[in-house]
Amino acid sequence: MSLFDHSVSELHKKLNNKEISVTDLVEESYKRIADVEDNVKAFLTLDEENARAKAKELDAKIGAEDNGLLFGMPIGVKDNIVTNGLRTTCASKILANFDPIYDATVVQKLKAADTITIGKLNMDEFAMGSSNENSGFYATKNPWNLDYVPGGSSGGSAAAVAAGEVLFSLGSDTGGSIRQPAAYCGVVGLKPTYGRVSRYGLVAFASSLDQIGPITRTVEDNAYLLQAISGLDRMDATSANVEVGNYLAGLTGDVKGLRIAVPKEYLGEGVGEEARESVLAALKVLEGMGATWEEVSLPHSKYALATYYLLSSSEASANLSRFDGVRYGVRSDNVNNLLDLYKNTRSEGFGDEVKRRIMLGTFALSSGYYDAYYKKAQQVRTLIKNDFENVFANYDVIIGPTTPTPAFKVGEKVDDPMTMYANDILTIPVNLAGVPAISVPCGFGANNMPLGLQIIGKHFDEATIYRVAHAFEQATDYHTKKASL
């Protein structure tokens, strides 16, 4: 039995009782990485020397003081979250050898909690993708079946947890990039409310949509990790000054009287029968525990995909303009003048998907098209947000599938961008509205790949999401299933 089959609270107890050491946990990670990483390819950079040194330092503290719950726990960090002195590439050749000079706020908080960073995790380049096939280095594979994608863009973060390489990880979610890979890899992934977790030190893709969040094996562990990284940060102008409650207190298993809304758009056209049936089965479980559900409508959901790609690509066009070969990152050698420097550095450094989105965003922001595309997309975004507010006036949570289907095979959709984009039709509306949502395992498809249940909550009401997710998790056994590599 792996140490990582235990929960955070169980491992914390074992550490305090000196049944195990922090070094044991770190070595568990690196041994598992040595065994499976050649196949999974979840990591881009390992930090073995520093991790082992930190483990020895923490071992000396066991029993000497009151250590927090995350003390000594091994974590993986998505490679678009900056780490001081530890290579951060965003899975892009343009940042292939970039060593940041500061830590992201979430990394500072994790260090303060005495977690140990095992390494940096693979992803779609600059978080643009749904399969991890857009990594500038190599594609991560799904631990449940190496012929399948792990999802994206936080594919490395989800795969590392599913493969038992780390206890938990951090990802980022712009249009589903935590929840979709969590669903595909059979783990738990939460996108917090926009502003709940500081974005300081997250390399920006789309600043009005990006949010850092936890990926774990269980809902309880997810709540522990969110508790540690949440809160106001003066270094992030979009960080919200909203009290962080005790997420663990609500994990009682009680959902009696809970009012669930199920959007007809989330079970209709484009959603596979397996995903639909898994949600209906989950609703029966929750109904049996005293919750009630009704069908509702989110009428503007049909515009979410187009709205998202216009807005996110427009923001990416602006955010990625900083990668020009002048200040940091790779610089082209094929240069005769300043224009060559900009053009050749970006042409050589960015992958095809990143270039595609930069071009789309630049077009949407260009003179003569701004009102027709970008401004109109912002107006539709407001309508989508209003849809959620109208539903939440009468219901506690919204439930539906995380993805339309289980994971697909490597290479199956890589040459068809529109088909690839459609994988996010159920997760994107959440980002546009800024509300929180979690994906928890809820079954398997005919291809024996995991399915995810998406539970969406009101702004800053992660506590209710966790309560529902935990109740469902404890009433079923999907969270006990493991990928067998």
UniProtKB/Swiss-Prot annotation:
<dbReference type="Pfam" id="PF01425">
    <property type="entry name" value="Amidase"/>
</dbReference>
<dbReference type="InterPro" id="IPR023631">
    <property type="entry name" value="Amidase_dom"/>
</dbReference>
<feature type="active site" description="Charge relay system">
    <location>
        <position position="153"/>
    </location>
</feature>
<comment type="subunit">
    <text>Heterotrimer of A, B and C subunits.</text>
</comment>
<comment type="function">
    <text>Allows the formation of correctly charged Gln-tRNA(Gln) through the transamidation of misacylated Glu-tRNA(Gln) in organisms which lack glutaminyl-tRNA synthetase. The reaction takes place in the presence of glutamine and ATP through an activated gamma-phospho-Glu-tRNA(Gln).</text>
</comment>
<dbReference type="GO" id="GO:0005524">
    <property type="term" value="F:ATP binding"/>
</dbReference>
<dbReference type="InterPro" id="IPR000120">
    <property type="entry name" value="Amidase"/>
</dbReference>
<keyword id="KW-0067">ATP-binding</keyword>
<keyword id="KW-0648">Protein biosynthesis</keyword>
<dbReference type="InterPro" id="IPR020556">
    <property type="entry name" value="Amidase_CS"/>
</dbReference>
<dbReference type="InterPro" id="IPR004412">
    <property type="entry name" value="GatA"/>
</dbReference>
<feature type="active site" description="Charge relay system">
    <location>
        <position position="78"/>
    </location>
</feature>
<feature type="active site" description="Acyl-ester intermediate">
    <location>
        <position position="177"/>
    </location>
</feature>
<comment type="similarity">
    <text>Belongs to the amidase family. GatA subfamily.</text>
</comment>
<protein>
    <recommendedName>
        <fullName>Glutamyl-tRNA(Gln) amidotransferase subunit A</fullName>
        <ecNumber>6.3.5.7</ecNumber>
    </recommendedName>
</protein>
<dbReference type="InterPro" id="IPR036928">
    <property type="entry name" value="AS_sf"/>
</dbReference>
<dbReference type="GO" id="GO:0006412">
    <property type="term" value="P:translation"/>
</dbReference>
<dbReference type="GO" id="GO:0030956">
    <property type="term" value="C:glutamyl-tRNA(Gln) amidotransferase complex"/>
</dbReference>
<dbReference type="GO" id="GO:0050567">
    <property type="term" value="F:glutaminyl-tRNA synthase (glutamine-hydrolyzing) activity"/>
</dbReference>
<keyword id="KW-0547">Nucleotide-binding</keyword>
<keyword id="KW-0436">Ligase</keyword>
